[in-house]
Amino acid sequence: MATSAQLREQITAGRWDGPLAALYGTAPQELARQRARYCAALEQFELYFGPGRQVQVYSAPGRAELGGNHTDHQHGYGLAAAVTLDLVAVAARNTDGYVRVKSRGFNKLDVIDLATAEPQEGESTHSASLIRGIAEGFRTAGKAIGGFDAYTASDVLRGSGLSSSAAFEMGMACIWNGEYACGLDARALAGICQYAENTYFGKPSGQLDQLASAVGGVIFADFADPAAPQVEKIHADGLLPPGMTLCVTDTRGSHSELTGEFAAIRQEMEAVAACLGGKVLGQVPETDFWAALPRLRTVCGDRAVLRAIHYYEENARTLAQRRALLEKRFADFAAMVLESGRASFALCQNVYCATDVRHQGLSVALALSQSILQGSSGAWRMQGGGFAGTIQAYVPETLLQRYHTAMERVFGPGSCYVLRLREQGARQVL
């Protein structure tokens, strides 16, 4: 192990270019940016927690949802990819039983007493609740953990659909796993992080986001048994055809205040399932749903019915998308991306909030994407939880400059990201 000052010297000298290139690519400009970013994070750690401490540096990627919008929490399928936008955490063990985390861009220093395991009043929906919940997840798994101090710097857009929460959670989990030699694998860490998000943070999410960040590459997951999801890793290299680029545009609307909207999707789907004798739609045959449609409209309401239809269609589509990727049939995959996007408008109804129709950033971004990409080999859809945040688009290189310029003209400089898929999951880097 090295001190933060020693690591900064080594990074500047290029000693760690190999591990950095494995995560971010070999382009000289990007490597220079990452060297500067890592050095800045190490400096900030020293500022908040003092110089001379031996530290380790961890990285947890964000994720792009490729298919399976709001299917994972119903015990369906999910398809997602880790991306090169990530959270970097500089960490050092301490001996006082406290966790202290300072995150770039946030004024508050999170301080968590590990002696207090239960969820704390007023802490839900805040990062401190995630840290406390992850600690309890490790203890429940029989692991002996202690305190640490950490500084985090995240390029994963907060509240934007790239799952900044999963990147933060996986960063914290990797620190404990590494600093205290817990030896848990990626899937176990993802389960602990989902537990923290559900039970302590108060967001009823599935596990797809955490798995994508933990495992890396492109993953296909079957959540029929959510306690032990079946995960298939599809290597990211070569999935996109030559000349095709994945872009994500931040419409500058945040998910941060939309927990109630997300929860309503799950609640309505599960209300339909309950009428048919199941807890989730994954336990209810689709034929039973269609047979009971008149009664379901009366009991659950039409929006719940439409969201259930979305689940069945999107789940089948996600399975077909997996096969298209494995067989390198990108044109078929792209056609299903468009179908998924249309379903978000018509069935799941999570492109904008019905209570705030004046603000429809996702709708505008999708319409603009259609105006540029229609008739090309590209595709576009909303991604993530919905209602605000980001859209994704597969953009041919011949249209990339036009697309990028148009999106940033509407949504502001720095809003359109040209992404690379990342093969590696959350891990210690230095």
Question: How should each PLM-predicted stretch be described?
Answer:
Residues 1-63, 88, 92-124, 220-381, ...:
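C-terminal nucleotide
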Residues 53-54, 70-77, 116-124, 154-162, ...:
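A short glycine/serine-rich beta->alpha loop
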Residues 59-64, 68-75, 155-172, 376-394:
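Glycine/serine-rich anion-binding loops at beta->alpha junctions
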Residues 76-96, 215:
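Structural signature of FAD isoalloxazine-binding scaffolds in flavoprotein oxidoreductases
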Residues 100-102, 147-154, 183-195, 334-339, ...:
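Beta-strand segments within the central parallel beta-sheet cores of soluble alpha/beta enzyme folds
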Residues 135-157:
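Glycine- and acidic-rich phosphate- and metal-coordinating loops
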Residues 140-148, 176-192, 397-410:
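Phosphate-handling active-site elements
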Residues 160-248, 430:
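Fold-level recognition of mixed alpha/beta catalytic cores in primary-metabolism enzymes, strongest
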